[in-house]
Design a protein with these regions (language model features):
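Helix-loop segments that flank and shape redox-cofactor active sites
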Residues: 1-12, 31-35, 80-96
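Charge-rich, low-complexity amphipathic helices
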Residues: 32, 39-40, 46-51, 110, ...
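Generic structural concept
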Residues: 11-14, 18, 25, 71-74, ...
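Acidic/histidine-rich alpha-helical segments that form the ligand environment
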Residues: 43-106
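Short, contiguous alpha-helical
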Residues: 23, 27, 98-123
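Charged/polar, solvent-exposed surface patches and flexible loops
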Residues: 26, 30, 72, 82, ...
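Residue-identity detector for glutamine
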Residues: 18, 34, 89, 116-117
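Conserved alpha-helical segments that form or flank metal/cofactor-binding pockets of metalloenzymes
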Residues: 5-45
Length: 123
């Protein structure tokens, strides 16, 4: 059920994403020296706009929550691919940044798999 998912699946994802965000923020600041890119108000506003595309998990079944989370992470994986390509084309993709983004993308694809498995309905 949801409580087990919350601790075991979503808890793991939340924790890892927080660590990932901190590492990316440090890298962005180190490479650009532009603190305004890391403004919490700006980041939260952008995240809210993106989340408006997806249904609220309120009153959803545990399966539907997993399926919605799966859609969110798949969309993010596609965005990541485009972001990586744009950085490369702009000659802003350092070896270290490429390594960090690739490791993050690998984790996100793992989340997609785990969420897909959780979203399977019992037959």
């Amino acid at each position: 059920g949801f409580s087990g998912d919350h601790v075991n699946l979503y808890g793991m994802i939340y924790t890892e994403l927080q660590e990932e965000f901190d590492a990316v923020a440090e890298r962005v600041l180190g490479l650009t020296n532009q603190e305004e890119l890391l403004c919490p108000k700006h980041i939260i506003s952008m995240a809210l706009e993106l989340l408006k595309k997806y249904p609220s998990p309120v009153n959803m079944s545990d399966i539907d929550i997993a399926l919605t989370a799966h859609k969110v992470i798949l969309d993010y994986c596609l965005w990541e691919n485009n972001f990586h390509m744009h950085l490369d084309q702009a000659n802003m993709l350092t070896i270290g940044l490429d390594d960090l983004l690739s490791a993050n993308a690998s984790n996100h694809e793992r989340y997609a798999y785990l969420l897909q498995q959780r979203g399977k309905r019992s037959v």
